[in-house]
Amino acid sequence: MVIVGAGFGGLAAARELEGAPVDVTLVDRNNFHTFQPLLYQVATSGLSPSDVAYPVRGIFTRQRNLAFRRDTVVAVDWEARRVRLGGGGHLPFDRLIVAAGATVNDFGVPGVAQHGFPLYVLPDAVRLRNHILGRFEAADAEPALVDDGGLTFVVVGGGPTGVEVAGALAELIDKVLHRDFRGSRVDVARAAVILVEMTDELLPPFSPSSQRHARTTLARKGVHVRTGTSVAEVGPTRVVLAGGEEIRAHTLVWAAGVRASPLAAALGVPTTGGGRVAVGPDLRLAGHPEAFVVGDMAAIDDGAGLLPGVAQVAMQSGRHAARLVGREVVGEGDPHEAFRYRDKGTMATIGRRSAVAELPPGIRLRGTVAWVAWLGLHLVYLMGFRNRVSVFVNWAWNYLTWDRGARLILGSGEGDAERG
């Protein structure tokens, strides 16, 4: 069988099939798995890229029934039962699990693709880090840039990613860069972080009390929160809001949403809003009982609406699809059991010693307790023992010293040439 994608859903499916009497080929364009929940810490210099990525082959060193193929699946030939690879050639399959994930959705806002900084894959985080640090270096060389918005950072999207980026960026500026540029020509105190959210409240999935806590905490960190408005246009040095207001800013971080991978449209099957693929209760494709779609790419309806594109859904749906494949192969159990999502709660960190967590049945945590729970959960799910140790050491050092050791500009410079 073939599994497309080495994200949370694809890895969960592949690991579930360990020991099953099937030969598995896992295909991904990268030879590493990225722990996306911590990408914002790479972008804000808290962690290094290698801390949040782990080699795929290393994950499956002991799984004898799995082979990895570094490539991209661009189409599926249903009649011949094979996937077409971007690098040329095909892979045959008896059964297929598609877990190709999602990509950034700019909703057609003019200028976002050209001038905005997404934060969805590892190179995005490195480019954004280069750019943030580069803006301060540029302002040191030319202080007048501050008057033109050179140190104004607009974050679009008030969900967990946007809130986490805004809080971490405000702390980076206030506690680290303020110290780094002491005595330089940069007036770091004039740097500004603005968080823009289209709805009236931050963190829409959370309760009103958690939303208020997030807003209050961000304000205390110096983040300017703008709710009830959206971005209408983005230029290289300006952001125009829906009401016509113009913000002079050289940086726009786009955390406003995602859409299904382009592979969804290439499958030749019905899709829903956001390009997600419609699946049956058992996650199979209608008309293609040999194929499953899981994770962010699947429109999974649990009766109360479509499930969100989060890691929990991806992992649980990936494991479920793999279990059904195993049942079919061995001829035991129900191979068409409906998928049932078990909500384990939602968390978002707002910065040092501040987070919100809502866990079933109705448990709500805020502040330091939620922050510690957030840290522990992410360490548990992070791939690789070395990565867990490295991240823990970095977090401990940052907590004790307010230092962020990954303040490095890599590659071509500050990242402007690589924007979008």
Predicted feature residues:
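Beta1-alpha1 glycine-rich phosphate/pyrophosphate-binding loop at the start
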Residues: 1-67, 74, 153, 160-206, ...
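Short hydrophobic core segments
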Residues: 2-4, 91-103, 231, 239, ...
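Short glycine-rich anion-binding loops that position phosphate/pyrophosphate groups of nucleotides
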Residues: 9, 101-104, 166, 258-260
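A Rossmann-like FAD-binding core segment of flavoenzymes
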Residues: 64-75, 170-281, 285-287, 333
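FAD-binding core/adjacent interface of flavoenzyme oxidoreductases
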Residues: 66-154, 253
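FAD-site-proximal beta/loop scaffold in flavoenzymes
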Residues: 114-144, 237-240, 246-317, 323
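Rossmann-like dinucleotide-binding core of oxidoreductases
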Residues: 147-206, 210-213, 224-226, 308-338, ...
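C-terminal, flexible cofactor-proximal segment of oxidoreductases
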Residues: 322-420
